[in-house]
Design a protein with these regions (language model features):
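Short gly/ser-rich loop at a beta-strand->alpha-helix junction or flexible surface loop bordering the NTP-binding
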Residues: 1-89, 128
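Hydrophobic alpha-helical interaction segments
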Residues: 53-54, 58, 69, 78-157
């Protein structure tokens, strides 16, 4: 079972030529979930969207599902309908939007590093502003806490 960020495949053809292929985590997700009725969620969505630097070790891929799929290597989060979360098709897979991903990360209050990096990416990608986000009312106190760290995330001081 694949749990690292990327792996390399070395192949030799009939002429002895060696080829090197880089298989990224996003490639792995596309292979794993290409035909599955699911939406990438939480840390997995943040990685896939490029909001966080990712991790060199992925325990499982977090996905929203409407009914259990029992896919090895995933953690399934049941939702009544895909319309319950903001999502879009991105490079072949359904994934929560940036806004939904940020709200989900704040609600789960999971990996601080992923939350900080994701907020920092939004902040610096939008001209040092969080105006592109619509944070749910009950998550505003948590957002205020993380936002300060995110604004200073890339400072070298």
């Amino acid at each position: 079972q694949r749990k690292d960020f990327c792996f390399k495949i070395v192949m030799e053809d009939e002429k002895g030529v060696i080829a090197l292929e880089l298989h990224t985590y996003n490639d792995y997700l596309r292979d794993l979930l290409k035909d599955a009725p699911c939406i990438l969620a939480y840390d997995t969505a943040a990685d896939y969207l490029g909001l966080s630097n990712g991790s060199s070790f992925h325990e499982t891929a977090h996905i929203y599902v409407q009914s259990p799929l029992h896919i090895d290597g995933t953690t399934e989060h049941l939702i009544p309908s895909f319309s319950a979360v903001e999502h879009e098709r991105r490079n072949g897979l359904l994934c929560t939007t940036v806004n939904q991903t940020i709200n989900d990360l704040l609600r789960a209050d999971g990996d601080n590093q992923v939350i900080q990096e994701s907020l920092a990416d939004v902040y610096f990608s939008n001209g040092e502003s969080f105006d592109s986000l619509q944070i749910e009312q009950d998550l505003l106190p948590r957002f205020e806490k993380y936002k300060v760290w995110a604004m200073e995330y890339y400072d070298e001081e």
